[in-house]
């Protein structure tokens, strides 16, 4: 049986590791992966001083000591507010950033009111480590698909799973139900 031992230097990222103006409260949902260059990378949802969302990028050689690399993507008050649950990967020669913005407003038929999904496709600048947007779209057009995450399967498929719930309806739990919300 595996016995977990808490790392003595927890937390590995603290307020001192945030870029200037980033909220110490709205800093959450890390997604970590290892790249071909041997480094671990981590994207984290954050809220800058203007109240909109941003995605921070960190790097580590060992998974314990982390350095801030860049603000990978900024909302600039375009798509909701706080950006949660980021995921970042390469697919078909493009870079893909997934995130779940809070308090979205509709843009025609593309987005709906409330908490939605966002897929930003583009190229990552190798010098600035920022994502140059080419396409921005919803991942799902319903209201109960949030916080999607992916994994790369051994056969090369990118598999996505999401929370089949949303923040607007979470308080409406049926008391006689054994289950409430689930992953897709």
Language-model segments: residues:
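Beta-propeller and closely related beta-sheet repeat lectin domains
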Residues: 28-31, 84-87, 146-149
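Structural secondary-structure packing elements that flank or coincide with functional cores
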Residues: 153-154
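Beta-rich carbohydrate-recognition and catalytic domains
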Residues: 1-29, 34-79, 92-141, 162-184
């Amino acid at each position: 049986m595996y016995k977990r031992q808490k790392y003595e230097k927890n937390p590995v990222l603290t307020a001192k590791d945030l870029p200037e103006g980033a909220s110490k409260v709205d800093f959450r949902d890390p997604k970590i992966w290892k790249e071909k260059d041997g480094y671990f990378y981590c994207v984290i949802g954050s809220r800058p001083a203007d109240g909109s969302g941003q995605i921070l990028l960190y790097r580590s050689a060992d998974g314990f000591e982390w350095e801030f690399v860049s603000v990978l993507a900024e909302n600039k008050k375009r798509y909701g507010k706080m950006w949660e649950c980021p995921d970042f990967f390469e697919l078909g020669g493009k870079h893909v950033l997934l995130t779940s913005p809070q308090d979205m407003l509709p843009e025609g038929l593309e987005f709906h009111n409330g908490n939605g999904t966002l897929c930003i496709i583009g190229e990552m600048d190798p010098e600035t480590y920022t994502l140059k947007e080419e396409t921005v779209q919803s991942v799902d057009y319903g209201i109960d698909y949030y916080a999607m995450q992916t994994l790369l399967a051994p056969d090369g498929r990118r598999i996505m799973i999401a929370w089949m719930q949303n923040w607007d309806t979470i308080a409406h739990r049926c008391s006689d139900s054994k289950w409430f919300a689930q992953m897709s």
